Design a protein with these regions (language model features):
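Middle-to-C-terminal accessory/interaction subdomains
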Residues: 1-153
């Protein structure tokens, strides 16, 4: 989930003789990590972009997207598989998490924290544990929404 997908953090390319490919540029604002506001998990952000809006008008395209999502939700995007992947990435990071916070931990100083949403709530993450909770909660909520929107019908 990347609120600026299709606008800032994605690009389209095509190899000679190949199909159009969509790729992510970065995920710095993905998974509810945007500094200035909470990213809702229950909307399709890409349809706000004219490219995707036009694609989404094509019934065949929609059917293919929904079918592919149903397939992936049973394997790669299954809750259990996602949890295992996150756990394996955490294990791989190991002590690097502590080293990162030794170098960059000052960025959590309350005098430096600037991200608040429109209700005045802090958008700044204060710990690795809080960041992981936000990430896993956001992914779980997002997958449930997408199943309802794309795969459960």
């Amino acid at each position: 989930m990347n609120y600026d997908a299709g606008n800032l953090s994605t690009y389209v390319y095509k190899e000679l003789g190949g199909k159009l490919q969509l790729a992510a540029w970065d995920f710095n604002n993905g998974f509810d990590n945007y500094q200035w506001f909470h990213t809702e998990t229950d909307r399709l952000y890409t349809v706000e972009n004219s490219w995707f809006d036009r694609l989404w008008q094509d019934e065949s395209f929609k059917e293919h997207v929904c079918e592919r999502y149903r397939q992936l939700r049973e394997t790669t995007l299954a809750d259990e598989h996602i949890a295992e992947k996150i756990a394996s990435y955490q294990a791989e990071l190991g002590a690097a998490v502590d080293r990162n916070f030794k170098v960059w931990g000052y960025s959590f100083d309350e005098n430096l924290l600037v991200g608040t949403d429109k209700e005045g709530r802090s958008r700044d993450i204060g710990s690795y544990e809080a960041a992981m909770k936000q990430l896993t909660d956001t992914i779980r909520e997002r997958l449930a929404y997408l199943y309802k929107e794309l795969g459960g019908n």
